[in-house]
């Protein structure tokens, strides 16, 4: 959260005129989980569902948080009851949040998802495997091995999830998760 606000200030981000779209995993990465979740209440911040938000929702639904906790969700039990209630309410909003966001400018179409768009051709509203949208590393791993293919239907796809040393582009896919939690390197892609 603090790192994000510092970087946004350096980028001259204006909450009055700009919009920040997150590729998910807004939790389980540092100590300011609730503060980051509170950004969901601002008009300038939106997010797709990431696999960490999905793990939290699954923990709430099944009453078994072990998988989430070992993947960073332990913070949830370390906050006050009042803060836990607020975090729960904010996390539950991810039931209604999109897994995929499309942004169209006057000249380009961008698609934002957490891990992948699991098809070779994008179409708005097309049914795709949500587990792959949240978890798949196959396309990026294939690209790293030289098996690079564009996804039709949009100009640019922006993904997080799999950590890369620096913002990495293969065909029309951009990977921006530069492990800010450990490296302090928080990456952005400016659409307009």
Segments (PLM) and residue ranges:
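N-terminal active-site segment of His-dependent metallophosphoesterases
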Residues: 1-35
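A short acidic-Thr-Gly-centered motif at the start of a beta-strand
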Residues: 12-13, 37-40, 101-106, 148-150, ...
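Active-site neighborhood of divalent metal-dependent phosphoester bond hydrolases
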Residues: 16, 33-103, 107-108, 133-143
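Active-site neighborhood of phospho(di)ester-bond hydrolases with catalytic His/Asp-centered motifs
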Residues: 20-24, 47-51, 113, 155-162, ...
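Short, solvent-exposed loop/turn segments at secondary-structure junctions
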Residues: 28, 53-54, 116-120, 163-165, ...
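Short, well-ordered beta-strand micro-motif
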Residues: 102, 112-114, 188-192
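A short secondary-structure junction signal
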Residues: 114-115, 121-127, 169-170
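Conserved beta-sheet core of the metallophosphoesterase superfamily
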Residues: 134-192
């Amino acid at each position: 959260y603090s790192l994000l606000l510092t970087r946004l200030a350096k980028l001259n981000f204006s909450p009055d005129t700009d919009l920040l779209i997150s590729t998910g995993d807004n939790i389980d990465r540092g100590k300011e989980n609730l503060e980051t979740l509170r950004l969901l209440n601002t008009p300038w911040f939106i997010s797709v569902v990431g696999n960490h938000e999905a793990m939290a929702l699954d923990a709430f639904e099944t009453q078994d948080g072990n998988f989430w906790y070992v993947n960073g969700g332990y913070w949830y039990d370390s906050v006050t009851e009042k803060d836990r209630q607020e975090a729960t309410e904010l996390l539950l909003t991810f039931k209604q949040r999109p897994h995929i966001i499309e942004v169209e400018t006057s000249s380009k179409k961008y698609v934002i998802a957490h891990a992948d768009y699991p098809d070779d051709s994008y179409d708005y509203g097309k049914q795709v495997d949500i587990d792959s949208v949240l978890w798949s590393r196959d396309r990026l791993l294939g690209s790293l091995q030289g098996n690079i293919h564009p996804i039709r239907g949009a100009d640019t796809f922006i993904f997080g999830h799999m950590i890369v040393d620096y913002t990495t582009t293969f065909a029309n896919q951009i990977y921006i998760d530069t492990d800010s939690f450990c490296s302090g390197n928080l990456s952005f892609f400016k659409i307009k």
